[in-house]
Amino acid sequence: MSNKCDVVVVGGGISGMAAAKLLHDSGLNVVVLEARDRVGGRTYTLRNQKVKYVDLGGSYVGPTQNRILRLAKELGLETYKVNEVERLIHHVKGKSYPFRGPFPPVWNPITYLDHNNFWRTMDDMGREIPSDAPWKAPLAEEWDNMTMKELLDKLCWTESAKQLATLFVNLCVTAETHEVSALWFLWYVKQCGGTTRIISTTNGGQERKFVGGSGQVSERIMDLLGDRVKLERPVIYIDQTRENVLVETLNHEMYEAKYVISAIPPTLGMKIHFNPPLPMMRNQMITRVPLGSVIKCIVYYKEPFWRKKDYCGTMIIDGEEAPVAYTLDDTKPEGNYAAIMGFILAHKARKLARLTKEERLKKLCELYAKVLGSLEALEPVHYEEKNWCEEQYSGGCYTTYFPPGILTQYGRVLRQPVDRIYFAGTETATHWSGYMEGAVEAGERAAREILHAMGKIPEDEIWQSEPESVDVPAQPITTTFLERHLPSVPGLLRLIGLTTIFSATALGFLAHKRGLLVRV
């Protein structure tokens, strides 16, 4: 016996839940099948007496992320600003350098040119890439066949710029520079609004968090849908050979629907058997797109002692020996439950996963004591962490990355329906893909694709723009005249070379005119 409905949504993360809510609000009968014993997917809010609540997964929202802000507001959630009142720290070669603003300052003029050229070139290249079809960029194949490591080797002349650029890649996509396609990474940064928007706290992707945690987005939609959300129901089989689509779960329940939305990371499609088999390109694509590696760590203290030293808690930490490359203040908005959140990224997540939880905490505290110059960092009162690499129903975090050569070959099939199966998930978004914002965009777009297939809305309503949030307005990202026009290091060297040649020629001409050159 099967359970009948209009649409089965596979995956109860933010994308699947956003899709289910829109379809439910449109009068359709929806069932959500979630593999875990909770909704939320790659968002996960843990609650206990020691932490009150803590986001162990996706957490941050900011200006231009208007869909998640609208949905959360509709669900009665509020945001608060991540603390960035005091100074940030850039820790490099064993020394801490306090600063303000999105990027660490650089005092060496040659190094400054190199840093400036890197950020500018990233944004310039990004402007060449269409957000909805990166494979259509003029140099798509050339850039896709190149790793980010190869691009950094071409762009960065100084070790300082290369180190910070490498950290930027590690932090943005939880992968190593040699693992990711340059085209894909350039697209990823571009569709998040560029280098400054993606990396910034104030006026950027990390500006805010939800009071009570981001897990509430999915939980509150589950409250609205009631028993239509089925937990501990991993989907193992989808059959499209009959009049309706049959969906079978691991505990052998059968669900019958007119349409299916797959709202799981693309590679997790390999856990599902399909009849008929998936088309060739999708079948191959899902074997080629892994997720990043990250352990999210939150160290709790008696008080936010770093603020007494005029530090906000943001640390950018260079160096192979440092377990964590980036931190933010995770203290509650009321000033209690003082904490520092840090990411163990990419290969370091794989390496440090061999240690015990206690050993990781010790390494983090020793690092924070060194960077902050405070022994108070050695006295934590509590510790929480989440290793997303071990999650069988995520496969990693934050998101799927594309190795070289894959995006131009297979990217077109990411959102392409397979008969009556439509695809959501943050990976299929065109704006803030990889974030909660992208998850909402993708879920609602997939839901509207089904509404269009059912004849309920016209095709031109599938993709909808979102009005700017009145509560979290975006300020424009600006650059100075100098930042736009300063030469790169090779540009400067060419300039010096030309100037030298010109000067020598001019001197020779003058000497000749004045009869100072003697023929031998």
From Swiss-Prot:
Changing residue 365 to S: Complete loss of activity. Belongs to the flavin monoamine oxidase family. The record marks 156, 365, 382 as: Important for catalytic activity. Residues 2-489 are cytoplasmic. Gene3D superfamilies: 3.90.660.10, 6.10.250.130, FAD/NAD(P)-binding domain, Guanine Nucleotide Dissociation Inhibitor, domain 1. It catalyses: a secondary aliphatic amine + O2 + H2O = a primary amine + an aldehyde + H2O2; (R)-adrenaline + O2 + H2O = (R)-3,4-dihydroxymandelaldehyde + methylamine + H2O2; a primary methyl amine + O2 + H2O = an aldehyde + H2O2 + NH4(+); benzylamine + O2 + H2O = benzaldehyde + H2O2 + NH4(+). Pfam families: Amino_oxidase. Inhibited by deprenyl. The modification S-8alpha-FAD cysteine is found at residue 397. The modification N-acetylserine is found at residue 2. It comes from the Eukaryota. This is Amine oxidase [flavin-containing] B. GO terms for biological process: dopamine catabolic process; hydrogen peroxide biosynthetic process; substantia nigra development. Keywords: Acetylation, FAD, Flavoprotein, Membrane, Mitochondrion, Mitochondrion outer membrane, Oxidoreductase, Transmembrane, Transmembrane helix. Changing residue 192 to S: No loss of activity. The lineage of its organism: Eukaryota, Metazoa, Chordata, Craniata, Vertebrata.
